[in-house]
């Protein structure tokens, strides 16, 4: 594979803690590239430490875009991301620079390379009404309502899946159409697969899991707990994406005195390991065009680059 050819964008995906950021930084420094975040949690300003965003000194070395530009109170979606990414990509191309998209959120990569379903934004008042109904009546009642209004969606969703049940009802309430109808309509992709070089960094599993555990402890020592304490003090909706970032719910429980610090760390590590496992499975089945390689092979590929 040649990473620098034909004005193609570079996509670097992989599980959390796989060394993607360091690889992207080395590539960007060598090629004069712009690094564009493709991680759904690193967009949040409030969670620099706990989401392992690039360090400020690394961000100063090359341009980094779409990091920390969203407040935790925002229900930031793949649709928001694609709109922001389109603007950044246009700017990068006008500058004549190489765009390097890096992250672990498969849905974002799929939206970039396959297009996005055309679901219109749900008005805030409808979203709030559904959330209030969820809190008042419980998830089983909402699932029963969904079964009456969109039987196919209700059959697909777990009866305890609060987030997806609420989302399906919001879309029906706002548009009068089931979510599946909207998913059948997609927008043209920003980055068709033939216009990209796409890598998936695949470390050895046990080494990755050990690195995840060690990194979680490092993040706690580096200020993640204080970060979560500030976030919890805002009293935000626990269903917001930022409030469900790996480690946030467990650390909030610790701050409330419900569990010990050790228990919170154990939960946070386990949640992150399970997420990494799902990332392997998701990319293998959903985006088979990504070329899988070990971190060592990817580093060798970058270091062998000859930049004109």
Swiss-Prot record:
Protein encoded by which gene: miaA
Domain of life: Bacteria
Annotated InterPro entries: Dimethylallyltransferase, IPT, P-loop_NTPase
Family: Belongs to the IPP transferase family.
Role noted for this protein: Catalyzes the transfer of a dimethylallyl group onto the adenine at position 37 in tRNAs that read codons beginning with uridine, leading to the formation of N6-(dimethylallyl)adenosine (i(6)A).
HAMAP family on file: IPP_trans
Protein name: tRNA dimethylallyltransferase
Description of how the protein assembles with itself and partners: Monomer.
Keyword S-adenosyl-L-methionine: no
């Amino acid at each position: 594979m040649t990473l620098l050819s034909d004005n193609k964008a570079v996509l670097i995906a992989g599980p959390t803690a796989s060394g993607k950021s360091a690889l992207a930084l080395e590539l960007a420094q060598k090629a004069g590239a712009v690094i564009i975040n493709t991680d759904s949690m690193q967009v949040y300003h409030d969670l620099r430490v706990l989401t392992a965003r690039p360090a400020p000194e690394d961000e100063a070395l090359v341009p980094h875009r779409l990091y920390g530009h969203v407040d935790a109170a925002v229900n930031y979606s793949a649709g928001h991301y694609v709109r922001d990414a389109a603007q950044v990509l246009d700017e990068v191309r006008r500058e004549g620079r190489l765009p390097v998209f890096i992250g672990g959120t498969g849905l974002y990569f799929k939206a970039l390379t396959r297009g996005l379903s055309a679901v219109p934004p749900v008005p805030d008042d409808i979203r709030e009404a559904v959330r209030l109904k969820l809190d008042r009546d419980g998830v089983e009642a909402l699932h029963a309502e969904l079964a009456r209004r969109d039987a196919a969606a209700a059959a697909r969703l777990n009866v305890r899946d609060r987030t997806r049940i609420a989302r399906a009802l919001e879309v029906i309430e706002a548009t009068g159409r089931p979510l599946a109808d909207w998913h059948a309509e997609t927008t043209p992709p920003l980055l068709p697969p033939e216009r990209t070089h796409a890598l998936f960094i695949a470390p050895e599993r046990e080494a990755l899991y050990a690195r995840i555990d060690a990194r979680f402890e490092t993040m706690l020592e580096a200020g993640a707990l204080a970060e979560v304490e500030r976030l919890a003090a805002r009293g935000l909706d626990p269903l917001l994406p930022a409030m469900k970032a790996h480690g946030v719910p467990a650390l909030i429980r610790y701050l409330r005195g419900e569990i010990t610090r050790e228990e919170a760390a154990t939960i946070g590590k386990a949640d992150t390991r399970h997420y990494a496992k799902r990332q392997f499975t998701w990319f293998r089945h959903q985006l088979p065009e990504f070329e899988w390689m070990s971190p060592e092979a990817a580093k060798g590929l970058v270091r062998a680059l000859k930049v004109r």
